[in-house]
Every structure is written in structure tokens, then in C-alpha cells.
């Protein structure tokens, strides 16, 4: 049924998605969402404010209704216009190919000849220990010095506590 066959009252009682379906059926080509809302508003005699109040629900209804298909760049059409195989081709975004110049520049930056290959068999544990120059006696001396400092600190704290207790007793 054509939109021209409906009275103004019948159009106002129809859901916006039903009107959109009729618009697509008449035009028989995809249109942008903006054009669709403009046509619906003009058919219903809607003001800008009323359209703004209902536009979110209208967009949601278009997405949910299985008869409509969102194409690229806010363009909508009827799902029945597109065979299933054609849908993937038209609705999927195109992937841009990477430039080969950038890849060549990266390869030039990485000059792998500068790095020396090291065989794990060539590395011996003895060599590593010699490089680190670990002397266990040095660590023992440091530990003893730390222990002496802690003992001195404990003695000072105990002396201070005793002095504090004596002062309290005198008062």
C-alpha cells in the first residue's frame, strides 16, 4: 500500500518504522537516516522539537526491526533488497592496505649485523661468578657491623627508658 493512500489521521496512528518501511518501498533505493527522518516528519507534519523527542526511539526501532539494514555512512535500506551473500560485501568496511615504504624503513633501521650472536654453551658459570667478583667475607663483615649498630641502638633505648622511669618515680 502506498503512503498516498493513507489519510493524515491514519499516518499519525502508524508507528514511525511502518512509515519508514513504506517510504523505502516507494523509493526502492537506500537513503540516509537524515533524509528518512525529514520525510517522516514532513508526512506527519511534525515540528523539529517533536521529531527530536522521538528520533532516538525511531533509530532504535530501525535497528531492532529485521526488515531494515544499516549500510555504510548512515545509509539505510530494506534487507529484502540484498541477497545474503551480497550483504557481507556491502556492509563490511574496506581494509586499507599498509604502505610498503614504511615497512622498508623499519627494516633499514634494524641492522641485525651489529649484534653478536652468543652461544649458551660458551657461557660458563665460573666466568659469570668471576665477573661479579663476589667476596663472601665482605658481606660477613658488613653483617657484623650492622649487628653491632643494632646492639648499640637497643642499649640506648633501654637506658632512655630507665631514665624516664626514674624521673617518674621522683615526681
Swiss-Prot record:
User: What GO terms describe the biological role, i.e. biological process, of this protein?
Assistant: DNA-templated transcription; regulation of DNA-templated transcription
Q: Which GO terms describe its molecular function?
A: DNA-directed RNA polymerase activity
Q: Which InterPro entries match?
A: Asxl_HARE-HTH, RNAP_delta_N_dom_sf, RpoE
Question: Keyword Flavoprotein: yes or no?
Answer: no
User: Could you tell me which residue ranges the HTH HARE-type domain spans?
Assistant: 14-81
PROSITE patterns in the record, alphabetically? Answer: HTH_HARE
Location of the region described as Disordered in the Swiss-Prot/TrEMBL record: 138-171
Alphabetized, the UniProt keywords read:
DNA-directed RNA polymerase, Nucleotidyltransferase, Transcription, Transferase
Question: Can you cite an annotated GO cellular component?
Answer: DNA-directed RNA polymerase complex
Question: Which Pfam families does the UniProt entry name for this protein?
Answer: HARE-HTH
Q: Which family does it belong to?
A: Belongs to the RpoE family.
Quaternary state and interactors:
RNAP is composed of a core of 2 alpha, a beta and a beta' subunits. The core is associated with a delta subunit and one of several sigma factors.
Q: Which HAMAP family match?
A: RNApol_bact_RpoE
| Function text | Participates in both the initiation and recycling phases of transcription. In the presence of the delta subunit, RNAP displays an increased specificity of transcription, a decreased affinity for nucleic acids, and an increased efficiency of RNA synthesis because of enhanced recycling.
Which protein is depicted?
Answer: Probable DNA-directed RNA polymerase subunit delta
Amino acid at each position: 500500500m502506498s503512503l498516498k493512500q493513507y489519510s493524515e489521521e491514519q499516518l499519525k496512528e502508524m508507528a514511525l518504522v511502518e512509515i519508514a518501511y513504506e517510504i523505502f518501498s516507494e523509493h526502492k533505493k537506500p537513503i540516509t537516516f537524515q533524509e528518512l527522518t525529514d520525510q517522516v516528519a514532513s508526512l506527519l507534519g511534525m515540528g523539529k522539537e517533536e521529531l527530536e523527542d522521538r528520533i532516538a526511539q525511531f533509530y532504535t526501532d530501525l535497528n531492532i526491526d529485521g526488515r531494515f539494514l544499516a549500510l555504510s555512512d548512515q545509509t539505510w535500506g530494506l534487507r529484502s533488497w540484498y541477497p545474503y551473500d551480497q550483504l557481507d560485501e556491502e556492509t563490511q568496511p574496506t581494509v586499507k592496505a599498509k604502505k610498503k615504504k614504511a615497512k622498508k624503513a623499519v627494516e633499514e633501521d634494524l641492522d641485525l649485523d651489529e649484534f653478536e650472536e652468543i652461544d649458551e654453551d660458551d657461557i660458563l658459570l665460573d666466568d659469570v661468578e668471576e665477573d661479579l667478583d663476589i667476596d663472601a667475607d665482605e658481606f660477613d663483615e658488613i653483617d657484623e657491623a650492622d649487628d653491632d649498630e643494632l646492639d648499640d641502638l637497643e642499649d640506648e633505648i633501654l637506658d632512655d627508658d630507665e631514665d624516664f622511669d626514674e624521673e617518674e618515680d621522683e615526681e
